[in-house]
Amino acid sequence: MKVEKKDIYTHIILYNNDPKDDLKKQIDSFSIDMDNLIIDIKNQNINKVQLVLSFLKHATLWKKKNKSFILVVNDSKIDYDKEIICLPTLDEAVEYLYMEELERNV
């Protein structure tokens, strides 16, 4: 797992051999500061739908605190009608995050 702090968000990359429990602990630690999160799970070779759904609780918490919680997933079948934001590339995720920040500031 790789964690990078950017200007208005934290980017977490989950690699295929990383334990999912470590990621959940990492996310829980971020819930204290409530930074915007972009989590890249496109390198996972497991059932991505199940993995995405496991983040629903976290995404809801972030949304309540007016922060972004975005997953980068390279699976076009995943669409959750904004319950949880899933985008295919990091560039799209960053762009979406900045749009959400603009909306929150208006």
Predicted regions, residues:
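Amphipathic, Lys/Arg-enriched alpha-helical "gate/interface" segment within cytosolic domains
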Residues: 2-106
